[in-house]
Amino acid sequence: MTERIFAQGWAGEGRGLPYCEAGSGETIVAIIGDGGLPTRAHALLAERGRVIVFAMTDAGSPQEAARRIGAAVAALGIERFDLMGEGSGAAAAMWLAQAPEAEIGSVVLAAPVSVLGDLPDEAFREIKRPVLVLSGTRGQSAAGDRYRSLLPDCHFMFVYEAGPAIGAERPEALAFIAREFFERCDLFLVSRENGMVFP
């Protein structure tokens, strides 16, 4: 059902990359794991903004995937966006966050499964954008701890009762946390609606 609200298209160099898009307004670019489809979390985010989802399908290394996704985003005429990387898409998101030409606001990494490979530790420390790393309490990985230790402006949060597929298992939680972080960064833990800390 979620897939029905997303339009599909192709963008970028050569034959382009497939993507799914829904909503309007400020843009969130999501890079999801191998062959994934948009989840209810993406649909919820699309209720208050434009969401473009790229899947890590045969895009090569995370570095190459980031380059191609960056070209596709530029071809779509998007100048500024927030970025979300989920699962194996987190590494590509961090490579994209390194691109000097990309005007990226904040970055959310949901259950990252790998580190950046060839990117040296110093390159992590040069990322000045706010980054939030989310880890499910039922599927923690060492990658989240590594991102936390290297990124200068990194926040970390557990999502309870979630494993490695936070967007599928806890879509409301992922959408709420990501939206709050994109909009409020350091103040995101306190909801504007009721002033309560997110559980």
Which residues fall in each region the model found?
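Conserved loop-alpha-helix segment in the C-terminal half of the alpha/beta-hydrolase fold
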Residues: A43, L132-A162
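Short beta-to-alpha linker loops that shape the active-site pocket of alpha/beta-hydrolase fold enzymes
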Residues: A55-A59, V113, A162-G163
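Conserved acidic catalytic loop of the alpha/beta-hydrolase fold
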Residues: E64-F81
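Conserved hydrolase catalytic core segment
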Residues: E79-V115
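Active-site nucleophile elbow and catalytic-triad environment of alpha/beta-hydrolase enzymes
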Residues: V113-A123, R138-A142
